[in-house]
Amino acid sequence: MINRILEAIIAGLLVAAVGVAFVAVIYRYALDSALSWSFELSLALLTYITFLGAYLALRKGAHLKVTLLVDRLPRPLRGVSFLFNQVLIAMLGWIMLWHGGRQVMRFADQTTTVLEISTAWYYAAIPVAGGLILLDAIWLMGVGAIRLLQGNEADPRPNQSGEI
């Protein structure tokens, strides 16, 4: 359910970014006029697409991984490896949340040149994605530990991809 909501949000942002770029090109080449706000808006949209997309890929298990050694481990050690991986992911989420939040506060009083919106809106994508990553990793640690104690694979995601 969460994946589908994220996919819809990201798709909407992508459609908006493509629409803004298309309109900017039409204005530039067909009407010989530039839209001064198109770059700033496209940049904001692409920032959110990037960070929300990274979180969605994490939820689906779609990030690049090398499993040559882990696949050869016995199930309990694979589970420990999974839990350790989630600890590292949680640490990354915390770093993004903490330092991204500091960046938001640092640039809150600065505005963009054309749209005159706070640049904090650009940076807010980092702590938002970091918080989501942190919560997801904590949830997967809990579920993974329970599954491991029950004698199952720790990773609850089917084939490490798809809906949770």
Residue ranges and their predicted role:
Residues 1-164:
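Alpha-helical transmembrane segments and membrane-interface helix-loop junctions
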